[in-house]
Amino acid sequence: MSVACTIRRHIIEKLHVLNIDNFVVTNESILAKLIVDYPNNPDHGDLYTNAALILSKYIKKNPMDIAKILVDEFSSIKEISDINVVKPGFINFNISLDVWYEIIISINRLKEKFGHVNFGNGKRVNIEFVSANPTGPMHIGHARGAIFGDVLANLLERVGYEVVREYYINDAGAQVDVLVESVYLRYKEVLGENIVIGSGLYPGLYLKDIGKLLYQEYGSGLLGMDYSQRRRIIRDVSLMYLMKLIKEDLALLGIKHDIFTSESQLQKDNIVQKCVELLQEKQLIYYGTLDQPKGTEGINWKPRTQMLFKSTDFGDDVDRALQKADGSWTYFANDIAYHFYKISRGFQHMILELGSDHIGYVKRLKAAVKALSDGNATIDIKLHSIVNFLDNGAQVKMSKRSGEFLTIKDVIEKVGKDVVRFIMLTRKSDVVLDFDFAKVVEQSKNNPVFYVQYAHARVHSLIRNAPKILEIELVDFSVLSSKEEILLIKLLAKWQDIVEISAKTAEPHRITFYLIEVAEAFHALWGYGNKSTDMRFIVDNNINLTSARIYLAKSVGYVIASGLTIFSIVPLTEMK
């Protein structure tokens, strides 16, 4: 249990028996609002709580007066060395140094398992991510969402969830018809015809490889086939080939999905119809007309009666159409059917990773899941923004009219998988990220992945060169008394809290920020040793101080390795 969690538990124990003006806290919903956290300014103490502010709403008493009462009670908590109150009623704590020294011992005993917490309790979570259209190999623009989804899955597994990684193959609809027509042209090209790639078709040269496969298997036989048979053959061969390319690209990123679900197979299994029938049974479908969509003013638009889902009953802005004018299902109908299929497989918690251009789908999908599951299932939709690819500050063109684009393979060959994975997590997922090819290979503190890996490598260099140290139970850690050493220990103690909040908010970038902060504090401490021999990790003729600092350094290594493991990044023991 982390220091913050320990103090929170003690505070709750005190509040359960405390009587203030005949008010005793027995309502757990009140305690759920209790915060024990680290202040932004370390001068305000090691931890703070909002307990007095919460209780003032129920006791109808000035929070400063309540805080003074609480201070008397909380002062007996053995881990607390100092306590004070600041307006409007926050209570700040300083924690005994012995508690922080115990953190070093705990980390060295648990090693990379330090900070592991289990609040998932084996609950199943479905994470759908990537789901790129199978119309071509993955370009580097897909990498951010792919890495985010994979690392989030790792993180949720770390905190005790059973995670299923799923990829939805969009192998039905207009884009597949365009793919078939584009491949057929390339097939004709292989046969020697001069072709013209029309507007709206896929121009990529990779399609010529599929044309060659078709020629090897069928010769010129496809030319004489009827349209439906030829379409089926080209479709099946193309999708198989392109999904193989996509899986290979994902493997280059270190990503492997557990399940691949086909949209066309769901249609064959009448999942859409079954989903619609369920909504009809729930009386959540009606026939009506919608207002003209925003942004279409001036366009020749005519209202028509159509099948609508009552999504506004579940928090959406408008009700949603399920059928097109020609009677075929809308994209939304297929989408909610897919989530109905997930629910039918027993998933009560789903996470969906989408590009930020899909922000309009958030409310409607949440509404659909709530309706289909009677509120028993939830979906968390995580949006990722674009990545600007730069080379020493200059924009890198992502695509050309020829259909060529910057591939995942290109980037990994240039900078390496681990660099790509780390850099993609250096910003909150819905914030635009700059990926500069020149900067991500710099060996400087301006390159976060180098900075973190260098800290880990420095730890191992130190261990390799250190003399034999004392057994940990024989070390007097009170010799670690400098401001920089205590700051680093307190930072390491936050690791469990960082893992927990990152998992609960589905924000793995918090771990990236934390690892950079740990590396920065460690490098700073190392730098002080370059200025003063007394601050070096290995101090001649002082085996106790050397041992204490080596165990502190090893703690840094274990925490960094633990974080990088969540990212599926190999921690380096030496820099090359």
Swiss-Prot record:
Record flagged with keyword ATP-binding: yes
Entries under InterPro entries matching the protein: aa-tRNA-synth_I_CS (IPR001412), Arg-tRNA-ligase (IPR001278), Arg-tRNA-synth_N (IPR005148), Arg-tRNA-synth_N_sf (IPR036695), ArgRS_core (IPR035684), DALR_anticod-bd (IPR008909), Rossmann-like_a/b/a_fold (IPR014729), tRNAsynth_Ia_anticodon-bd (IPR009080)
Subcellular location: Cytoplasm
Residue positions of motif 'HIGH' region: 132-142
UniProt GO cellular component terms: cytoplasm
Single GO term (MF): ATP binding
Main location: cytoplasm
EC numbers on record: 6.1.1.19
Chemical reaction(s) catalysed: tRNA(Arg) + L-arginine + ATP = L-arginyl-tRNA(Arg) + AMP + diphosphate
Biological process, per Gene Ontology: arginyl-tRNA aminoacylation
Keywords annotated in UniProt: Aminoacyl-tRNA synthetase, ATP-binding, Cytoplasm, Ligase, Nucleotide-binding, Protein biosynthesis
SMART domains reported for this sequence: Arg_tRNA_synt_N, DALR_1
UniProt enzyme class: ligase
Cytoplasm is among the record's keywords: yes
Alphabetical list of Pfam families matching this protein: Arg_tRNA_synt_N (PF03485), DALR_1 (PF05746), tRNA-synt_1d (PF00750)
PROSITE patterns: AA_TRNA_LIGASE_I
Quaternary data: Monomer.
Family per record: Belongs to the class-I aminoacyl-tRNA synthetase family.
PANTHER family in UniProt: ARGININE--TRNA LIGASE, CYTOPLASMIC (PTHR11956:SF5), ARGINYL-TRNA SYNTHETASE (PTHR11956)
Protein name: Arginine--tRNA ligase
Organism: Ehrlichia ruminantium (strain Gardel)
